[in-house]
């Protein structure tokens, strides 16, 4: 409820940034490990889902450097382990956190208006089972964002405003689903350690490039036939209408003189106005 109310309150008069970590407070993962007794793996899993919530919410997502590769530290003066040197060697294909951020940022970039301006409505969820699904809608486009904080995958039914039989795609994993007769989509939200995220969108149907419209072909054939019948006549007409070289020179001279006359008239008018002033 809080996030839905926040979403409704934010508009283009606000410059609101949401962040999980900063230079003067404990990092998100570090705070879970040191304050709540999470293991490193548990904190990493929670951070993945938190990043999904952050990057799919209205507002400006602020990523504290290193967060995207799994770095975190404490605001423990004078050591300040939250102000670490950036470790670029962690930005690899094998780094789950890094790939998670790349995937989410790519999706947010593709649907900027939906995430920056869209409405937010909770459509499914369970505190006990640890998952939540919200719809983000703007300009005729609706995305369904599912998040799972548990260490096991969740099979859930997501109510959608789409017709039965419509194909939907999970932008996060690439998996496709079909809307059931009850206008729900049965999806699997992965465990938190695997990203804990699904982002569903309708698959728009496009025209089969292998099929052609017969009407344009028929029209083209008719035009070609007409062109063959009248080709000789058109050639003769063109020859008759073609001007002689002398006519070309006269026409060019006339256009040139007309242009000079217009310039002279404009200049005279300008001088007259200045004289009157």
Where are these regions (language model features)?
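Carbohydrate-binding surface patches
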Residues: 123-162, 201
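Juxtamembrane/start-of-transmembrane alpha-helix segments at the extracytoplasmic/lumenal side
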Residues: 245-257
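C-terminal low-complexity, Ser/Thr- and acidic/Pro-rich disordered "stalk" regions positioned immediately N-terminal
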Residues: 207-248
């Amino acid at each position: 409820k809080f996030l839905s109310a926040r979403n409704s309150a934010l508009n283009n008069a606000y410059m609101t940034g949401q962040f999980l970590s900063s230079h003067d407070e404990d990092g998100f993962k570090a705070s879970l490990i040191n304050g709540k007794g999470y293991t490193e793996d548990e904190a990493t899993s929670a951070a993945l889902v938190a990043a999904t919530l952050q990057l799919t919410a209205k507002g400006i997502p602020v990523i504290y450097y290193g967060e995207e590769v799994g770095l975190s530290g404490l605001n423990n003066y004078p050591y300040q382990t939250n102000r670490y040197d950036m470790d670029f060697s962690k930005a690899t294909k094998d780094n789950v956190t890094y790939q998670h951020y790349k995937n989410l940022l790519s999706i947010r970039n593709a649907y900027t208006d939906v995430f920056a301006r869209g409405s937010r409505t909770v459509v499914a969820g369970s505190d006990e089972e640890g998952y939540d699904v919200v719809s983000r809608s703007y300009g005729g486009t609706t995305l369904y964002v599912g998040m799972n904080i548990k260490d096991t995958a969740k099979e859930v039914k997501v109510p959608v405003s789409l017709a039965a039989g419509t194909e939907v795609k999970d932008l996060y994993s690439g998996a496709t689903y079909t809307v059931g007769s009850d206008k729900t989509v049965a999806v699997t939200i992965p465990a938190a350690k695997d990203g804990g995220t699904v982002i569903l969108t309708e698959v728009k149907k496009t025209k089969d490039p292998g099929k052609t419209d017969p009407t344009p072909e028929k029209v083209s054939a008719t035009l070609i036939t007409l062109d063959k019948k009248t080709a000789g006549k058109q050639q003769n007409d063109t020859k008759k209408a073609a001007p002689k070289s002398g006519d070309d020179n006269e026409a060019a001279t006339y256009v040139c003189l007309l242009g000079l006359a217009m310039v002279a008239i404009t200049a005279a008018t300008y001088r007259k106005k200045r004289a009157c002033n």
